[in-house]
UniProtKB/Swiss-Prot annotation:
Other remarks on this protein: Dicyclohexylcarbodiimide (DCDD) binding to the active aspartate residue inhibits ATPase in vitro. Fusion proteins corresponding to c(2), c(5) and c(10) permit ATP synthesis in reconstitution experiments with F(1) and in the absence of F(1) function as a proton channel; other fusions of c(3) to c(14) do not.
Organism: Bacillus sp. (strain PS3)
Name listed for the protein in its UniProt record: ATP synthase subunit c
Lineage: Bacteria, Bacillati, Bacillota, Bacilli, Bacillales
Family stated for the protein in its record: Belongs to the ATPase C chain family.
CDD domains for this protein: ATP-synt_Fo_c_ATPE (cd18185)
InterPro entries in alphabetical order: ATP_synth_csu_bac/chlpt, ATP_synth_F0_csu, ATP_synth_F0_csu_DDCD_BS, ATP_synth_F0_csu_sf, ATPase_proteolipid_c-like_dom, F/V-ATP_Csub_sf
Amino acid sequence: MSLGVLAAAIAVGLGALGAGIGNGLIVSRTIEGIARQPELRPVLQTTMFIGVALVEALPIIGVVFSFIYLGR
């Protein structure tokens, strides 16, 4: 196993770990906000989905960079 494959696996794994933690924090804070002010649910959910999408973009970019690196 080459070091390039190991580096790509670590990059993808850490990206997924960070995204999982970030998504958990985003969703938990959104639920807390909805519990405090239920009338703001639509606004908070919209903001949550945008935040989750931005956080999920990072592991996808990591996978793409790993494939590009391994393709060389």
